Curated annotation (Swiss-Prot):
Location within or outside the cell: Cytoplasm
A GO molecular-function descriptor: ribosomal small subunit binding
Protein's UniProt name: Ribosome-binding factor A
Domain of life: Bacteria
Keywords for this protein: Cytoplasm, Ribosome biogenesis
Oxidoreductase keyword on record: no
SUPFAM superfamilies: Ribosome-binding factor A, RbfA
Physiological role: One of several proteins that assist in the late maturation steps of the functional core of the 30S ribosomal subunit. Associates with free 30S ribosomal subunits (but not with 30S subunits that are part of 70S ribosomes or polysomes). Required for efficient processing of 16S rRNA. May interact with the 5'-terminal helix region of 16S rRNA.
Family membership: Belongs to the RbfA family.
Subunit annotation: Monomer. Binds 30S ribosomal subunits, but not 50S ribosomal subunits or 70S ribosomes.
Amino acid sequence: MAKEFSRTQRVAQEMQKEIAIIIQREVKDPRIGMATVSGVEVSRDLAYAKVFVTFLNDNEPEQVKTALKALQDASGFIRTLVGKAMRLRVVPALTFSYDNSLVEGMRMSNLVTNVVRNDTERRSVTGEDQED
């Protein structure tokens, strides 16, 4: 019977849960604020993990940069706690990256909404002109 998920995918899912809990409960750095772990990619040999995060108030790029620096500084602490929680022989080295897919998704949604609104307004204006 074939496995539905590979070991790296299972480790990545579990790491995402654990890192989210650790950032929320254990990391006390005020520079981080409200961080959400949106995904984790683990290398095949489980030596490296890229952690994608978003922040609640990520309007300013400087705040995002500061928060990422704080997370990277705390990566050793987070890695230790992940190792204890997951009981892995090799705990991946953590690298934190900003995940802008949520912001890009909202931007694209706004663009589509504006285009639909403009199209509707254009149709209503041209429809009124044809009736007269």
